[in-house]
């Protein structure tokens, strides 16, 4: 018995007339004059394969009762399909029914249109739909491409901790990790919670970023990256925010902001090319049902050189745009999505790297420029979504870093280990961060980031 994936069976690389076995789930079934036509999917590709069963099979009556979602093992001869819509089909010599759907009428995944809002309520079943099958395969393709890009460019992958004592962003929006009894919290002499009696002997949190930790390895191995889960206790109910998401964070030694921007451009174009080359079937479905520009926008992104513009110049352009924005535009305020999209879509018409932001709106670790007012920071803006990458050259001068930490109200002793990097062989270095789910949203044309991750975690939502 030669078990093959549906993708392999449809690819035209197996000998026609050979016997094969596929294992999967029923997508649809229709009958006609002693025949049953079963569309079977195993998730390996977008298209199902048609299994043709005739009434000579001993369990044909059982086969006719199959419904969407039932699991089976079908064996038979692989032949060119005479019908439209598929290249090959299987003339079944046997169909073993492995699992029935208990009640087809109440099975949540029906062969009919279903809203993303409904499917979020059954997130454990939604990968069985065409949409989320496609999104999941594209997510996997992107993840594989991320690792491949960095490996091919000499980066080492670093596993940074999920439990930490440091706030990498200085914003304080962190989830606390504790085994203390929440009903009877231990107190010290001053009445504060005594975290010395907690599991780790101190306050600990879920990480908001692996950047500070990965910098340590950058200053020893030169080119490194981390790719893992991060957590933000940000009480935001927008379509752009998650409480748990994955971050890609490369870091390069002996590098400035210009080199950081080049790396970001090379990286994005590489992973987009991988999706175009490897997941054309899924992109075609998304272009038909979700975002008509799913393919063309990636091709345009790859072929367009990035435009680079200083934040100060971007503000001037926006102020003279002849357009009324919902959010104010003035020097010293962060750019909002509507501003970013105007720059990329209406004014410049391609991806834009905005650099040198005001120092007070960016993180403490970003390198202070000579003007004393801006930092060597960048945001990569993409048409259709706005910011997709945020990065900077890091502050390598200990005295300047200490002053920045004081400005942000951070205890430098708490970050003594991070300051050590500036005390022992400090070098200029740079990096960026990219929320992986935002990348998935952009590629797939999704309208809500909660559809870009298998089990979304957001305020008031932690199901499954």
From Swiss-Prot:
Keyword list (alphabetical) reads: Aminoacyl-tRNA synthetase, ATP-binding, Cytoplasm, Ligase, Nucleotide-binding, Protein biosynthesis
Give me the reactions it catalyses.
tRNA(Asn) + L-asparagine + ATP = L-asparaginyl-tRNA(Asn) + AMP + diphosphate + H(+)
Give the taxonomic lineage as stored in the record. Bacteria, Pseudomonadati, Pseudomonadota, Gammaproteobacteria, Lysobacterales
Q: Which GO terms describe its molecular function?
A: asparagine-tRNA ligase activity; ATP binding; nucleic acid binding
Its Enzyme Commission number(s) read 6.1.1.22
Q: How does it assemble?
A: Homodimer.
* Protein's organism: Xanthomonas oryzae pv. oryzae (strain KACC10331 / KXO85)
- List the InterPro entries hit by this protein, alphabetically: Aa-tRNA-synt_II (IPR004364), aa-tRNA-synth_II (IPR006195), aa-tRNA-synth_II/BPL/LPL (IPR045864), Asn-tRNA-ligase (IPR004522), Asp/Asn-tRNA-synth_IIb (IPR002312), NA-bd_OB-fold (IPR012340), NA-bd_OB_tRNA (IPR004365)
Please give the GO cellular component terms listed in this UniProt entry: cytoplasm
Looking up Gene3D superfamilies in the UniProt record yields: Bira Bifunctional Protein, Domain 2, Nucleic acid-binding proteins
PROSITE patterns attached to this UniProt entry: AA_TRNA_LIGASE_II
Tell me the name of the encoding gene.
Answer: asnS
What's the name of the protein?
Asparagine--tRNA ligase
Gene Ontology process terms (BP): asparaginyl-tRNA aminoacylation
């Amino acid at each position: 018995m030669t078990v093959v994936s549906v993708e392999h069976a449809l690819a035209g690389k197996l000998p026609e007339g050979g016997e094969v076995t596929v294992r999967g789930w029923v997508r649809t079934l229709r009958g006609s004059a002693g025949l049953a036509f079963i569309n079977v999917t195993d998730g390996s590709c977008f298209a199902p394969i048609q299994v043709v069963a005739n009434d000579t099979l001993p369990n044909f009556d059982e086969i006719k009762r199959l419904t969407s979602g039932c699991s089976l093992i079908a064996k038979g001869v692989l032949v060119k399909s005479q019908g439209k819509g598929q290249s090959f089909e299987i003339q079944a010599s046997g169909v073993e029914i492995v699992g029935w759907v208990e009640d087809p009428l109440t099975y949540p995944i029906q062969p009919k249109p279903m809203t993303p809002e409904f499917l979020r309520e059954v997130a454990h079943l939604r990968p069985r739909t065409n949409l989320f099958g496609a999104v999941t395969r594209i997510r996997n393709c992107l993840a594989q491409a991320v690792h491949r890009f960095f490996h091919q460019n000499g980066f080492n992958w670093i596993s940074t901790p999920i439990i930490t004592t440091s706030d990498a962003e200085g914003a304080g929006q962190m989830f606390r990790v504790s085994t203390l009894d929440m009903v009877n919290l231990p107190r010290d002499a001053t009445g504060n919670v005594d975290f010395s009696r907690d599991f780790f002997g101190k306050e600990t949190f879920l990480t908001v970023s692996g950047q500070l930790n990965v910098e340590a390895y950058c200053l020893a191995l030169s080119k490194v990256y981390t790719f893992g889960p991060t957590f933000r206790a940000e009480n935001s109910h927008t379509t752009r925010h998650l409480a748990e998401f994955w971050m890609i964070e490369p870091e390069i030694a002996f590098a400035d902001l210009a080199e950081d921007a080049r790396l970001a451009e090379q990286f994005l174009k590489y992973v987009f090319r991988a999706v175009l080359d490897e997941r054309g079937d899924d992109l075609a479905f998304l272009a038909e049902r979700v975002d008509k520009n799913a393919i063309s926008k990636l091709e345009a992104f790859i072929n367009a050189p990035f435009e680079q513009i200083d934040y100060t110049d971007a503000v001037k352009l926006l102020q003279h745009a002849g357009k009324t924005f919902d959010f104010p535009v003035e020097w010293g305020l962060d750019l909002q999505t509507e501003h970013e999209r105007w720059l990329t879509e209406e004014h410049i018409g391609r991806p834009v790297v905005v650099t040198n932001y005001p120092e007070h709106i960016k993180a403490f670790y970003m390198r202070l420029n000579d003007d004393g007012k801006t930092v060597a920071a960048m945001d990569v803006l993409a048409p259709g979504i706005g910011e997709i990458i945020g990065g900077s050259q890091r502050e390598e001068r200990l005295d300047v870093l200490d002053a920045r930490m004081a400005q942000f109200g951070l205890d430098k002793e708490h970050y003594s280990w991070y300051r050590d990097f500036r005390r022992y062989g400090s070098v200029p270095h740079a990096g960026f961060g990219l929320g992986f789910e935002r990348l998935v949203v952009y590629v797939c044309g999704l309208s809500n980031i909660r559809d870009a991750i298998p089990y979304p975690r957001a305020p008031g939502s932690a199901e499954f």
